[in-house]
UniProtKB/Swiss-Prot annotation:
It comes from Human immunodeficiency virus type 2 subtype A (isolate SBLISY). The keyword Mitochondrion does not apply. It is a lipid-anchor. Homodimer. Interacts with host CD247/TCRZ; this interaction induces down-regulation of cell surface TCR/CD3 complexes. A lipid is attached at residue 2 (N-myristoyl glycine). Keywords: AIDS, Host cell membrane, Host membrane, Host-virus interaction, Lipoprotein, Membrane, Myristate, Viral immunoevasion, Virulence. Residues 88-96 are annotated as: Acidic. One of its GO terms (cellular component) is host cell plasma membrane. This is Protein Nef. Belongs to the lentivirus primate group Nef protein family.
């Protein structure tokens, strides 16, 4: 999906997956294996994975919504504010993990629906995110990678609030975050858990859930986020202000 409409697309290297796996999990970065209900350890450089005991266990087009909250292009001030809030704490170790140049290879541009679908497909083809534990650091590394390699301004990767499945706010990004159950016995396996990337990533979530990235091709056809949670788009939702604020309050989501 997405290939026929593109003239040319760059090829993210498989190294992106390795760098994301190393982030927060050290040499023990891993993937959630749904079929096994457990943890798969990635051995750097080998391209192989080794099973370990579980430690954690209607279609729509872009113009179909009159009130679809398409992002207003960010101002330079907003871009700088984003960088200060989200990128300043990315240290030299993160630069090494990302493995890209300090400057973008192409002119900066805003993410579009078509680009989001294409990037989602490319990353899937490379095995980059499926089953990978989510963490704030991996989130930032992905932002940096796409900014430097593709020139995509890193203001697009946001997800709905929990509990439960977190859907991408940007229509066209086909990766959602799905909570996985951590078996109680796994939490008692001290040696593995202290090294296990998921034991770090769950603390990145205010609801304490351990999340993994999961590819969902239907997100290219249905704006699930806007259908289920229009209140999260605030003034851009098309709802009366009192209504969307009431819904956010009922869900315990802060708003201004």
């Amino acid at each position: 999906m997405g290939a026929s409409g593109s003239k040319k697309r760059s090829r993210p290297s498989r190294g992106l997956q390795e760098r994301l796996l190393r982030a927060r999990g050290g040499a023990c970065g891993g993937l959630w294996d749904e079929s096994e209900g457990g943890y798969s350890q990635f051995h750097e450089g080998s391209g192989r994975e080794q099973k370990l005991p579980s430690c954690e266990g209607q279609r729509y087009q872009q113009g179909d919504f009159m009130n679809t909250p398409w992002r207003t292009p960010a101002t330079e001030k907003e871009k700088e504010s984003y960088r200060q809030q989200n990128m300043d704490d990315v240290d030299s170790d993160d630069d090494d993990l990302v493995g890209v140049s300090d400057t973008s290879r192409v002119p900066l541009r805003a993410m579009t629906y078509r680009m989001a679908v294409d990037m989602s497909d490319l990353i899937k083809d490379k095995g980059g995110l499926e089953g990978m534990y989510y963490s704030e650091r991996r989130h930032r590394i992905l932002d940096i990678y796409l900014e430097k390699e593709e020139g995509i301004i890193p203001d697009w990767q946001n997800y709905t609030h929990g509990l439960g499945v977190r859907y991408p706010m940007f229509f066209g990004w086909l990766w959602k975050l799905v909570p996985v159950t951590v078996p109680q016995e796994g939490e008692d396996t001290e040696t593995l858990c202290l090294m296990h990337s998921a034991q770090v990533s769950r603390f990145d979530d205010p609801h304490g859930e351990t999340l993994v990235w999961k590819f969902d091709p239907m997100l290219a056809h249905e704006y699930t986020t806007f259908i289920l949670y229009p209140e999260e788009f605030g003034h851009k939702s098309g709802m009366e202000e009192d209504d969307w604020k009431a819904k956010l309050k009922a869900r315990g989501i802060p708003f201004s």
